[in-house]
Amino acid sequence: MEYTYKSPLGDILISYNDHAITGAIFDGQQTSEYAENTVITECIKQLDEYFGGTRQSFDLPLEPKGTDFQKSVWLALQSIPYGETRSYAQVASLLGRPKASRAVGGANNKNPIHIIIPCHRVIGANGALTGYAGGLERKTTLLTLEKSNSL
């Protein structure tokens, strides 16, 4: 099932089943019908709180589809504190694979649940903002939102 969430950064297409969020990606101006259920209702509430500056982490059941390595990266991304960033190399080290920063970048790029799995918090080793599937402008806005609400 799918739902289009209208965020301040544009539409976010949220995929879900009866038990968990399975995807959350930026979308164009499409609209989708959705079946009311507790998972999507809670997701909408938490996204509203996040964009309103009152939520710093998400507490939702997630079922992202990916390889075991990708899933381990996505789990590690969820440990990056709100308002902070980590480099690809730091995430690789966190996984016990310090030479896997490129593989971490590849997994980060394949993250199917944007914002909720905070791939926007990963930056280049030199501190530069690097690719984000939702676009660098959105990444900048998300990081700015988090920094301004974490003081």
Mark where each language-model region is.
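Active-site and channel-lining beta-strand-loop segments
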Residues: I12, V122-G124
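Regulatory, non-catalytic segments
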Residues: R102-N111
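Short Lys/Arg-enriched helix C-cap and helix-to-coil transition segments
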Residues: I115-V122
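Basic nucleic-acid-binding alpha-helical/helix-turn surface characteristic of O6-alkylguanine DNA
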Residues: M1-K99, L145, N149-L151
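…primarily DNA-binding HTH/wHTH and HhH modules…
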Residues: A125-L151
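Short clusters of hydrophobic/aromatic residues that line enzyme substrate/ligand-binding pockets
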Residues: L60-L62, V104, L129-Y132
